[in-house]
Regions:
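Assembly/oligomerization scaffold segments
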Residues: 1-104
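Extracytoplasmic/secreted envelope proteins and their assembly/folding machinery
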Residues: 80, 129-132, 165-169, 227-228, ...
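An acidic/polar, Gly/Ser/Thr-rich interaction patch typically located in mid-to-C-terminal regions
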Residues: 26, 30-60, 211-360
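Short beta-strand-centered interaction patches in the first periplasmic/extracellular domains
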Residues: 94, 101-104, 145-213
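Short acidic/polar beta-strand-loop edge motifs in secreted extracellular
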Residues: 106-134, 145-170, 286
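Long, low-complexity intrinsically disordered regions
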Residues: 134-146, 350-360
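Short, compositionally biased
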Residues: 81-89, 192-194, 311-323
Length: 360
Protein backbone atom coordinates (compact mmCIF):
# COMPACT_ATOMS: atom_id res chain seq x y z
CA UNK A 1 0.00 0.00 0.00
CA UNK A 2 1.37 3.37 -1.05
CA UNK A 3 2.32 5.79 1.69
CA UNK A 4 -0.13 8.60 2.18
CA UNK A 5 1.24 12.05 1.27
CA UNK A 6 2.34 14.22 4.16
CA UNK A 7 0.50 17.51 4.08
CA UNK A 8 1.73 20.67 5.80
CA UNK A 9 -0.87 22.24 8.05
CA UNK A 10 -1.25 25.28 10.25
CA UNK A 11 -3.66 26.64 12.84
CA UNK A 12 -4.14 30.33 13.53
CA UNK A 13 -6.03 31.79 16.47
CA UNK A 14 -6.96 35.48 16.69
CA UNK A 15 -7.71 36.60 20.23
CA UNK A 16 -8.20 32.87 21.02
CA UNK A 17 -10.78 32.35 18.23
CA UNK A 18 -9.82 29.85 15.52
CA UNK A 19 -9.69 31.69 12.16
CA UNK A 20 -7.88 28.97 10.19
CA UNK A 21 -10.87 28.11 7.99
CA UNK A 22 -11.78 31.77 7.56
CA UNK A 23 -8.45 32.75 5.98
CA UNK A 24 -7.72 29.45 4.20
CA UNK A 25 -9.21 30.46 0.84
CA UNK A 26 -7.44 33.83 0.95
CA UNK A 27 -4.02 32.70 2.17
CA UNK A 28 -1.15 33.52 -0.21
CA UNK A 29 1.73 32.95 2.18
CA UNK A 30 2.56 32.60 5.85
CA UNK A 31 6.07 33.24 7.12
CA UNK A 32 7.38 32.80 10.67
CA UNK A 33 10.89 34.06 11.42
CA UNK A 34 12.65 32.84 14.56
CA UNK A 35 15.55 35.14 15.48
CA UNK A 36 18.39 34.55 17.91
CA UNK A 37 18.64 36.67 21.01
CA UNK A 38 16.54 39.77 21.51
CA UNK A 39 15.54 40.28 17.88
CA UNK A 40 11.78 39.86 17.86
CA UNK A 41 10.37 36.75 16.24
CA UNK A 42 7.96 37.81 13.51
CA UNK A 43 4.86 36.40 11.86
CA UNK A 44 3.90 37.72 8.41
CA UNK A 45 0.64 36.64 6.73
CA UNK A 46 -0.26 37.70 3.18
CA UNK A 47 -3.89 37.36 2.10
CA UNK A 48 -5.66 37.86 -1.24
CA UNK A 49 -7.87 40.96 -1.02
CA UNK A 50 -9.00 41.04 -4.63
CA UNK A 51 -12.79 40.97 -4.24
CA UNK A 52 -14.24 44.47 -3.62
CA UNK A 53 -17.56 42.87 -2.73
CA UNK A 54 -15.92 40.87 0.06
CA UNK A 55 -13.02 42.93 1.41
CA UNK A 56 -11.09 41.45 4.32
CA UNK A 57 -11.94 43.08 7.61
CA UNK A 58 -8.98 45.04 8.92
CA UNK A 59 -7.63 43.36 12.06
CA UNK A 60 -6.97 45.82 14.88
CA UNK A 61 -3.38 46.51 15.83
CA UNK A 62 -2.77 44.88 19.18
CA UNK A 63 -4.74 41.77 18.25
CA UNK A 64 -3.13 38.54 19.45
CA UNK A 65 -2.32 35.78 16.99
CA UNK A 66 -1.33 32.27 18.06
CA UNK A 67 0.32 30.08 15.41
CA UNK A 68 0.84 26.32 15.25
CA UNK A 69 2.66 24.53 12.41
CA UNK A 70 3.20 20.91 11.45
CA UNK A 71 2.04 18.07 9.24
CA UNK A 72 -1.21 16.08 8.96
CA UNK A 73 -2.71 17.19 12.25
CA UNK A 74 0.50 16.89 14.26
CA UNK A 75 0.83 20.56 15.05
CA UNK A 76 3.36 22.27 17.29
CA UNK A 77 2.61 25.61 18.92
CA UNK A 78 5.00 28.24 17.62
CA UNK A 79 4.14 31.18 19.82
CA UNK A 80 2.03 34.22 20.56
CA UNK A 81 2.28 37.36 18.43
CA UNK A 82 0.83 40.88 18.61
CA UNK A 83 -0.28 42.59 15.37
CA UNK A 84 1.66 45.83 14.97
CA UNK A 85 1.57 46.55 11.22
CA UNK A 86 -0.85 46.22 8.29
CA UNK A 87 -0.01 46.74 4.63
CA UNK A 88 -2.56 47.04 1.80
CA UNK A 89 -1.29 46.72 -1.78
CA UNK A 90 -2.50 46.21 -5.34
CA UNK A 91 -2.93 45.10 -7.99
CA UNK A 92 -3.99 42.37 -7.38
CA UNK A 93 -5.28 43.43 -4.01
CA UNK A 94 -3.42 41.99 -1.05
CA UNK A 95 -3.27 42.49 2.69
CA UNK A 96 -0.12 41.75 4.66
CA UNK A 97 -0.39 41.37 8.43
CA UNK A 98 2.81 41.62 10.48
CA UNK A 99 2.93 40.61 14.11
CA UNK A 100 5.81 40.39 16.56
CA UNK A 101 6.29 37.89 19.34
CA UNK A 102 5.17 39.09 22.73
CA UNK A 103 7.23 38.23 25.81
CA UNK A 104 4.12 38.20 27.96
CA UNK A 105 1.38 35.59 27.70
CA UNK A 106 -2.00 37.27 27.24
CA UNK A 107 -0.47 40.75 27.01
CA UNK A 108 -1.13 43.52 24.54
CA UNK A 109 1.91 45.38 25.82
CA UNK A 110 4.57 43.72 23.69
CA UNK A 111 8.05 44.69 24.85
CA UNK A 112 6.99 48.09 26.25
CA UNK A 113 7.36 47.20 29.93
CA UNK A 114 10.86 45.80 29.50
CA UNK A 115 11.83 48.79 27.36
CA UNK A 116 11.02 51.45 29.96
CA UNK A 117 14.19 53.22 31.08
CA UNK A 118 15.38 53.01 34.68
CA UNK A 119 18.25 54.35 36.75
CA UNK A 120 19.66 52.17 39.53
CA UNK A 121 22.81 50.40 40.67
CA UNK A 122 23.58 46.75 41.27
CA UNK A 123 26.15 46.14 44.04
CA UNK A 124 29.45 44.39 43.52
CA UNK A 125 29.41 40.56 43.72
CA UNK A 126 25.77 40.26 42.63
CA UNK A 127 25.39 36.96 40.70
CA UNK A 128 24.11 37.39 37.16
CA UNK A 129 21.34 34.90 37.91
CA UNK A 130 20.05 37.13 40.73
CA UNK A 131 19.88 40.10 38.34
CA UNK A 132 17.80 38.12 35.85
CA UNK A 133 15.52 36.73 38.54
CA UNK A 134 14.96 40.18 40.08
CA UNK A 135 14.07 41.78 36.75
CA UNK A 136 11.86 38.84 35.79
CA UNK A 137 9.94 39.15 39.06
CA UNK A 138 9.47 42.89 38.54
CA UNK A 139 7.74 42.13 35.24
CA UNK A 140 5.80 39.14 36.60
CA UNK A 141 7.83 36.78 34.42
CA UNK A 142 9.53 33.50 35.27
CA UNK A 143 13.33 33.44 35.05
CA UNK A 144 14.98 30.51 33.26
CA UNK A 145 18.74 30.83 33.75
CA UNK A 146 21.46 28.38 32.70
CA UNK A 147 23.57 27.38 35.75
CA UNK A 148 26.86 28.38 34.08
CA UNK A 149 25.45 31.88 33.51
CA UNK A 150 23.67 32.19 36.86
CA UNK A 151 26.89 31.72 38.82
CA UNK A 152 28.80 34.57 37.15
CA UNK A 153 29.64 37.15 39.83
CA UNK A 154 29.36 40.72 38.55
CA UNK A 155 31.35 43.80 39.45
CA UNK A 156 29.38 46.90 40.44
CA UNK A 157 26.88 47.74 37.68
CA UNK A 158 25.18 51.06 36.96
CA UNK A 159 21.94 51.00 35.01
CA UNK A 160 21.68 54.66 33.98
CA UNK A 161 18.59 55.69 31.99
CA UNK A 162 18.67 52.20 30.50
CA UNK A 163 15.83 49.76 29.96
CA UNK A 164 15.87 46.43 31.75
CA UNK A 165 16.06 44.51 28.49
CA UNK A 166 18.93 46.61 27.13
CA UNK A 167 20.80 46.18 30.42
CA UNK A 168 20.33 42.40 30.29
CA UNK A 169 21.39 42.21 26.65
CA UNK A 170 24.55 44.15 27.50
CA UNK A 171 25.41 41.78 30.33
CA UNK A 172 24.59 38.67 28.30
CA UNK A 173 26.81 39.74 25.40
CA UNK A 174 29.71 40.41 27.76
CA UNK A 175 29.68 36.77 28.84
CA UNK A 176 28.77 35.25 25.45
CA UNK A 177 25.21 34.60 26.51
CA UNK A 178 21.82 35.21 24.95
CA UNK A 179 18.77 36.68 26.66
CA UNK A 180 15.28 36.26 25.28
CA UNK A 181 11.86 37.09 26.71
CA UNK A 182 9.18 34.72 25.43
CA UNK A 183 5.85 33.32 26.56
CA UNK A 184 6.01 34.86 30.01
CA UNK A 185 9.57 33.71 30.68
CA UNK A 186 12.91 35.49 30.69
CA UNK A 187 15.49 33.02 29.37
CA UNK A 188 19.26 33.43 29.76
CA UNK A 189 21.54 30.78 28.25
CA UNK A 190 25.09 30.39 27.03
CA UNK A 191 25.22 31.07 23.30
CA UNK A 192 24.85 27.80 21.46
CA UNK A 193 23.29 26.12 24.50
CA UNK A 194 19.92 27.84 24.37
CA UNK A 195 16.74 26.60 25.95
CA UNK A 196 13.09 26.79 25.04
CA UNK A 197 10.79 29.19 26.87
CA UNK A 198 9.86 26.21 29.04
CA UNK A 199 13.49 25.83 30.11
CA UNK A 200 14.21 22.62 28.18
CA UNK A 201 17.40 22.32 26.15
CA UNK A 202 16.77 22.67 22.42
CA UNK A 203 17.41 19.24 20.87
CA UNK A 204 20.16 18.88 18.27
CA UNK A 205 18.78 18.47 14.74
CA UNK A 206 20.80 16.04 12.59
CA UNK A 207 20.78 16.61 8.82
CA UNK A 208 22.19 14.50 5.98
CA UNK A 209 22.46 15.58 2.32
CA UNK A 210 19.10 14.06 1.44
CA UNK A 211 17.38 16.34 3.97
CA UNK A 212 18.66 19.55 2.39
CA UNK A 213 17.42 21.28 -0.78
CA UNK A 214 20.46 23.55 -1.13
CA UNK A 215 23.21 25.03 1.03
CA UNK A 216 25.98 27.61 1.00
CA UNK A 217 28.96 27.88 3.36
CA UNK A 218 31.17 30.97 3.53
CA UNK A 219 34.64 30.53 5.04
CA UNK A 220 36.79 33.50 5.97
CA UNK A 221 39.92 34.10 8.00
CA UNK A 222 39.26 37.82 8.19
CA UNK A 223 38.79 37.83 11.96
CA UNK A 224 40.40 34.56 12.92
CA UNK A 225 40.66 33.46 16.50
CA UNK A 226 43.97 35.17 17.13
CA UNK A 227 44.48 36.60 20.59
CA UNK A 228 42.07 38.63 22.69
CA UNK A 229 43.54 40.68 25.52
CA UNK A 230 41.44 42.09 28.38
CA UNK A 231 42.75 44.32 31.16
CA UNK A 232 41.83 44.51 34.81
CA UNK A 233 42.92 46.92 37.50
CA UNK A 234 44.86 45.44 40.43
CA UNK A 235 43.92 47.94 43.12
CA UNK A 236 46.44 46.91 45.79
CA UNK A 237 49.34 46.95 43.36
CA UNK A 238 47.95 50.05 41.62
CA UNK A 239 48.74 48.64 38.20
CA UNK A 240 47.15 47.21 35.12
CA UNK A 241 47.12 43.44 34.61
CA UNK A 242 46.13 41.56 31.49
CA UNK A 243 44.42 38.31 30.60
CA UNK A 244 44.99 36.64 27.23
CA UNK A 245 42.77 34.17 25.42
CA UNK A 246 43.97 32.44 22.26
CA UNK A 247 47.28 32.84 20.50
CA UNK A 248 48.88 34.38 17.46
CA UNK A 249 47.66 37.15 15.18
CA UNK A 250 45.52 39.17 14.94
CA UNK A 251 45.59 40.63 18.44
CA UNK A 252 42.49 42.42 19.73
CA UNK A 253 42.78 44.48 22.91
CA UNK A 254 39.48 45.21 24.62
CA UNK A 255 39.19 48.90 25.44
CA UNK A 256 37.28 48.46 28.66
CA UNK A 257 39.05 47.96 32.00
CA UNK A 258 37.58 45.28 34.28
CA UNK A 259 37.50 45.18 38.05
CA UNK A 260 38.62 41.59 38.58
CA UNK A 261 40.61 38.95 36.66
CA UNK A 262 37.69 36.53 36.37
CA UNK A 263 35.51 39.23 34.82
CA UNK A 264 38.26 40.18 32.37
CA UNK A 265 38.79 36.53 31.45
CA UNK A 266 35.08 35.98 30.83
CA UNK A 267 34.92 39.06 28.58
CA UNK A 268 38.00 37.99 26.62
CA UNK A 269 36.67 34.45 26.22
CA UNK A 270 33.30 35.73 24.99
CA UNK A 271 34.94 37.94 22.36
CA UNK A 272 37.30 35.17 21.28
CA UNK A 273 34.44 32.69 20.88
CA UNK A 274 32.48 35.22 18.85
CA UNK A 275 35.44 35.89 16.53
CA UNK A 276 35.99 32.19 15.94
CA UNK A 277 32.32 31.56 15.16
CA UNK A 278 32.28 34.33 12.54
CA UNK A 279 34.87 32.51 10.43
CA UNK A 280 32.28 30.13 8.97
CA UNK A 281 28.63 30.83 8.18
CA UNK A 282 26.01 28.52 6.71
CA UNK A 283 22.75 29.11 4.89
CA UNK A 284 20.52 26.27 3.75
CA UNK A 285 16.94 25.49 2.81
CA UNK A 286 14.97 22.28 3.18
CA UNK A 287 11.43 20.94 3.49
CA UNK A 288 9.73 22.40 6.55
CA UNK A 289 11.12 21.39 9.95
CA UNK A 290 9.42 23.13 12.88
CA UNK A 291 11.96 21.58 15.26
CA UNK A 292 14.69 23.86 13.87
CA UNK A 293 14.92 26.81 16.27
CA UNK A 294 17.14 29.86 16.56
CA UNK A 295 20.06 29.20 18.94
CA UNK A 296 19.51 25.49 18.41
CA UNK A 297 22.27 23.14 17.29
CA UNK A 298 22.55 21.47 13.89
CA UNK A 299 24.69 18.41 13.23
CA UNK A 300 25.46 18.02 9.51
CA UNK A 301 26.74 14.58 8.52
CA UNK A 302 27.75 13.14 5.16
CA UNK A 303 28.66 16.45 3.55
CA UNK A 304 32.15 17.41 2.38
CA UNK A 305 34.73 18.70 4.92
CA UNK A 306 34.01 22.30 5.81
CA UNK A 307 30.27 21.65 5.74
CA UNK A 308 29.85 18.60 7.97
CA UNK A 309 29.98 19.28 11.68
CA UNK A 310 28.16 21.28 14.34
CA UNK A 311 26.46 24.61 13.65
CA UNK A 312 24.48 27.05 15.78
CA UNK A 313 21.31 28.45 14.20
CA UNK A 314 21.15 32.26 14.21
CA UNK A 315 17.94 32.56 12.19
CA UNK A 316 15.24 30.13 11.07
CA UNK A 317 12.50 31.12 8.64
CA UNK A 318 9.45 28.90 8.13
CA UNK A 319 7.38 29.62 4.99
CA UNK A 320 4.07 28.11 3.93
CA UNK A 321 2.52 28.88 0.51
CA UNK A 322 1.22 27.12 -2.60
CA UNK A 323 4.66 25.54 -3.09
CA UNK A 324 4.49 23.85 0.30
CA UNK A 325 6.25 24.26 3.64
CA UNK A 326 9.94 25.23 3.61
CA UNK A 327 12.52 26.11 6.24
CA UNK A 328 15.48 28.40 5.55
CA UNK A 329 18.34 28.56 8.04
CA UNK A 330 21.30 30.82 8.77
CA UNK A 331 23.92 29.47 11.16
CA UNK A 332 27.43 29.97 12.52
CA UNK A 333 29.93 27.20 13.05
CA UNK A 334 30.06 25.95 16.61
CA UNK A 335 33.06 27.37 18.43
CA UNK A 336 34.89 24.07 18.90
CA UNK A 337 34.45 23.14 15.23
CA UNK A 338 35.56 26.57 14.06
CA UNK A 339 38.62 26.50 16.30
CA UNK A 340 39.64 23.18 14.76
CA UNK A 341 39.35 24.72 11.28
CA UNK A 342 41.87 27.42 12.22
CA UNK A 343 44.63 24.95 13.05
CA UNK A 344 47.39 24.70 10.50
CA UNK A 345 46.98 21.64 8.30
CA UNK A 346 49.52 18.86 8.54
CA UNK A 347 52.34 19.30 6.00
CA UNK A 348 51.84 17.43 2.77
CA UNK A 349 54.21 14.52 2.20
CA UNK A 350 57.24 15.37 0.07
CA UNK A 351 56.85 14.43 -3.58
CA UNK A 352 59.32 11.90 -4.92
CA UNK A 353 60.58 12.00 -8.46
CA UNK A 354 59.74 9.00 -10.63
CA UNK A 355 56.94 7.97 -8.23
CA UNK A 356 53.86 6.96 -10.20
CA UNK A 357 50.60 8.74 -9.36
CA UNK A 358 48.33 6.92 -6.94
CA UNK A 359 44.57 6.98 -6.52
CA UNK A 360 42.36 6.28 -3.53
Amino acid sequence: QAAQPVRPQYRLLANRADITATIAERLISLRYTDEAGLDSDMLEITLADHDPARPIQLPPTGAELELSLGYDGRLQRVGLFVVDELELSGWPGQMTIRARATPFEGSKGGMSQLQSQKTRSWPKDTPLGDVVRTIAAEHKMQAVVAPEMASIVLPHQDQMDESDINFLVRLAKRYDGVIKPAAGKLVLAKRGQAKTAGGQSIPTVRLVPGDVSDYRVSLTKRDGGGTVVAYWHATKQAKREEVKIGQGEPVLRLKRYYQAPEVARAAAQAEYDSRVRRQATLSLSMPGRIDVLAEGRLELAGFRPGVSGAWIVTRAEHSLDNEGYRTSIEAEQEQAEAAAETKAPAPAPALRRRSPPTSD
